[in-house]
From Swiss-Prot:
GO terms for molecular function: amino acid transmembrane transporter activity; symporter activity. Pfam families: Aa_trans. It is a multi-pass membrane protein. The chain crosses the membrane at residues 75-92, 95-115, 152-172, 188-208, 212-232, 248-268, 282-302, 330-350, 372-392, 394-414, 441-461. Residues 1-74, 116-151, 209-211, 269-281, 351-371, 415-440 are cytoplasmic. Coiled coil: none annotated. The keyword Acetylation does not apply. This is Auxin transporter-like protein 3. Carrier protein involved in proton-driven auxin influx. May mediate the formation of auxin gradient from developing leaves (site of auxin biosynthesis) to tips.
Length: 547
């Protein structure tokens, strides 16, 4: 297998060093005296040192690199919205859905890896060379099932990655507001859009070695900060845990978790960056296990501490008091979101490069310039729909459900539908899954469940919630869920009554009759969390914790 490809349009990462050493050898063969040999030796040592450093930080293709990439890409800004989902679902459902969708996501990532190996093996039997070409999911579908599957896969995958990048950009603006509210969130979106555009200079997933490692460390800190800070903070006065209060909120929260464990839209690109892609099969499952050690404690602790107050604060950091520890979590999450933006955008860069004919171009500058148009619609959409939290659920139900659950399951069943294809398969289903029969039963269940619960109920609930956000805040919202500025609050009449937070949906308890327990009245805006926070901060810049 040509698994040593760079995955980014570069033939061989060892090429420059080898060429230099070869030139030095020729120089020594033709003579030139001791001085020439001494200079050549010094040059060789410097080149070797640079090559080793570059390999350590820049060129990653091991199974460990793939694990870091999968784990880092899977849990970014969504970590901050999971407590919000717990408030919508309730503690028990939140925990169960995380475990269930984590297992489901690991299974479909395994299917994608098997289809990739099947496609690549067939192509390499025909002497196809992939050293200057990155294989992508839509090409796997094209090679195994034809152009109609390719078109469907390309449409869903690109749209999901587009909005996945939008979500990261929205998350950057939402987070930075907690340590610097001198600028509104829309202005921060402009700034971070320009910063994230620099990801055009990262050639491929092969070059994310140090970034994946650092990104996972940063998310680990943020997750445990939320968990520990929530426990130390304790439950706010009058805390209520009334979720689920409506069927709309319930399925909205469930689809956000579906989105959380649906980060394998970049699985094929990560596999292609590996030196031995055959080792990928269990990597996503191992990454999911680690991610669960971050998401379960942080989400459950935050929900325990703040309860229903999270319904009006889709970012968990909004309710935690400002401290240097929280500021550090915000900064680290910002850096990780920049990295995750690159993860989501890189496959889009590849598609665009192939469209304009520059995918095999050896010039990084030309490719970077060609990639810039991809960033512009992402920037624009982040300004139109700044709804941090609700947009996750909408993307999860409408795009993730098909991209990473339904299409891979159906593609696997259709690819191996004939006895001959099953007999010649590069990789057979594991025995613990029941062989071919068990694999087809599991895939049928995945398709039915995600189609009905994820896309059907989840799509209806998420769109209802999303439309409510648009009706409440409007498109191009300048500062989504921001508290009123102190100067504006001082101008309001003394007897004026503050409006209730508009981010909470009106009660849908009548809709939920017969599904949930007796309807619980919608909780008041719950001043207790904010009262607690305000009691610890006297400076007016420090007590603006609303999202």
């Amino acid at each position: 297998m040509a698994s040593g490809s760079s995955g980014g349009g570069y033939a061989d990462e060892k090429g420059p060093g080898a060429a230099t050493m070869q030139a030095l050898g020729l120089q020594q063969q033709h003579g030139g005296g001791g001085e020439v040999e001494e200079e050549s030796s010094e040059m060789g040592e410097k080149t070797a040192a640079r090559t080793r450093l570059s390999g350590l930080l820049w060129h990653g293709g091991s199974a460990y690199d793939a694990w870091f990439s999968c784990a880092s890409n899977q849990v970014a800004q969504v970590l901050l919205t999971l407590p919000y989902s717990f408030a919508q679902l309730g503690m028990a459902s939140g925990l169960l859905f995380q475990l269930f969708y984590g297992l489901l996501g690991s299974w479909t990532a395994y299917l994608i890896s098997i289809l990739y190996l099947e496609y690549r093996t067939r192509k390499e039997r025909d002497k196809v060379d992939f050293r200057n070409h990155v294989i992508q999911w839509f090409e796997v579908l094209d090679g195994l099932l034809g152009r109609h599957w390719r078109n469907v896969g390309l449409a869903f995958n690109c749209t999901f990655l587009l909005f996945g990048s939008v979500i990261q950009l929205i998350g950057c603006a939402s987070n930075i507001y907690y340590i610097n509210d001198h600028l509104d969130k829309r202005t921060w979106t402009y700034i971070f859009g320009a910063c994230c555009a620099t990801t055009v200079f990262i050639p491929s997933f092969h070059n994310y070695r140090i970034w994946s490692f650092l990104g996972l460390l940063m998310t680990t800190y943020t997750a445990w900060y939320i968990a520990v800070a929530s426990l130390i903070h304790g439950q706010v006065e009058g805390v209520a845990h009334s979720g689920p209060t409506s069927i709309v909120l319930y399925f909205t929260g469930a689809t956000n978790i579906l989105y959380t464990f649906g980060g394998h839209a970049v699985t094929v690109e990560i596999m292609h960056a590996m030196w031995r892609p055959q080792k990928f099969k269990a990597i996503y499952l191992l990454a999911t296990v680690y991610v669960l050690t971050l998401t379960l404690p942080s989400a459950s602790a935050a929900y325990w501490a703040f309860g229903d107050a999270l319904l009006t604060h889709s970012n968990a950091l909004a309710l935690l008091p400002r401290t240097p520890w929280r500021d550090a979590a915000v900064v680290l999450m910002l850096i990780h979101q920049f990295i995750t933006f690159g993860f989501a955008c890189t496959p889009l860069y590849f598609v665009w490069e192939k469209l304009v004919g520059l995918h095999g171009c050896p010039s990084l500058c030309k490719r970077a310039a060609a990639r810039l148009p991809v960033v512009l619609p992402i920037w624009f959409l982040a300004i139109i729909f700044p709804f941090f939290g609700p947009i996750n659920s909408a993307v999860g139900s409408l795009l993730v459900s098909f991209t990473v659950y339904i299409i891979p399951s159906l593609a696997y069943m259709v690819t191996f539908r004939s006895p001959q294809s099953r007999q010649n398969a590069v990789e057979r289903p594991p025995r613990f899954a029941g062989g071919w029969t068990g694999a087809y039963v599991i895939n049928s269940f995945v398709v039915a469940w995600v189609l009905v619960v994820g896309f059907g109920f989840g799509g209806w609930a998420s769109i209802t919630n999303f439309v409510h956000q648009v009706d409440t805040f409007g498109l191009f919202a300048k500062c989504y869920q921001c508290p009123p500025h102190p100067a504006a609050a001082a101008l309001s009449p003394p007897g004026a009554i503050a409006p209730a937070p508009a981010s909470m949906l009106p009660p849908f308890n009548s809709t939920a009759a017969g599904i949930f327990a007796a309807p619980v009245p919608s909780p008041a805006p719950a001043p207790a969390p904010m009262h607690f926070v305000l009691g610890h901060h006297h400076h007016h810049r420090h007590h603006r914790h609303g999202l």
